[in-house]
Amino acid sequence: GDACSLLNGDDCGPGELCCTPSGDHQGTCETSCW
């Protein structure tokens, strides 16, 4: 998905979550996190 950052708040679209598998602030927008 698109890049997102938890530091800037969740900049993902409706129904998308900012997934950060590495536990970092940087992640990607996905419909579900696993």
UniProtKB/Swiss-Prot annotation:
It comes from the Eukaryota. GO terms for cellular component: extracellular region. Signal peptide: none annotated. Its main location: secreted. It is found in: Secreted. GO terms for molecular function: toxin activity. Disulfide bonds join 4-19, 12-29, 18-33. Expressed by the venom duct. Keywords: Disulfide bond, Hydroxylation, Knottin, Neurotoxin, Secreted, Toxin. The modification 4-hydroxyproline is found at residues 14, 21. The presence of a 'disulfide through disulfide knot' structurally defines this protein as a knottin. The cysteine framework is VI/VII (C-C-CC-C-C). This is Conotoxin Cl6d. It comes from Californiconus californicus (California cone).
